[in-house]
């Protein structure tokens, strides 16, 4: 029985030593590695963020055949600064509707700025931890990691899950005023990001014997920087989760804190 008790004490002591090393060394090393990943992610954004080049300009062609919908556009930063849009109406398939976006009234993609803001928040949570700070409990680390994970998830969701708006809200939306010429009141255009794609959707309200419904069609194009950003955000989340899982093992031992070893054990 005494040998068993001695073995248990030795195992507990070794676990305590590893716990202290993780808190004092490994947590800071992982936070530093994580910050490097997130700053690299920030540099991929087309808006000013962590000394990147700022407003990058790219051209895209979004089309669905046979000539049902086509948009030739310029994306500058988080806004569509120029676009030529043409599409066929479902109630008059031989008729082509045309409109455009000009530099004077750009179409803002709020998802880009939202994702950038959440990324900035995640980096700020890391910067709030001084390099010389000594974590004393697992709860401290889990609190910091939880805040970072929350910000990263919000950032990814901003790009993966576009906010859906009712068609009447789209028709009356601020961005619709960017179109020249303005579209008839039964038509709406929407630009949004979903995963690594830039998507244009056109909606038309239809009155079918007194019942209102809408017809829609969409076209898309792949955006390389979106793919890079989502991959780096995912890598950051994985690193956070690995640290969280490791710390959670120690959090089972509620009496584990830095300095809780007996004086005789401090020579280990």
UniProtKB/Swiss-Prot annotation:
Expression (tissue specificity): Expressed in both anterior and posterior regions of the brain including in GABAergic neurons.
One GO biological process term: gamma-aminobutyric acid secretion, neurotransmission
UniProt-listed Pfam families: Rogdi_lz
Keyword Nucleus: yes
Keywords of the record: Cell projection, Cytoplasmic vesicle, Nucleus, Synapse
Localization in the cell: Nucleus envelope; Presynapse; Cell projection, Axon; Perikaryon
Repeat keyword on record: no
A GO-annotated cellular component: RAVE complex
Role played: Plays a role in promoting sleep by enhancing metabotropic transmission of the inhibitory neurotransmitter gamma-aminobutyric acid (GABA) in GABAergic neurons upstream of a wake-inducing dopaminergic pathway.
Similarity comment: family membership: Belongs to the rogdi family.
Protein name in UniProt: Protein rogdi
Encoding gene (name): rogdi
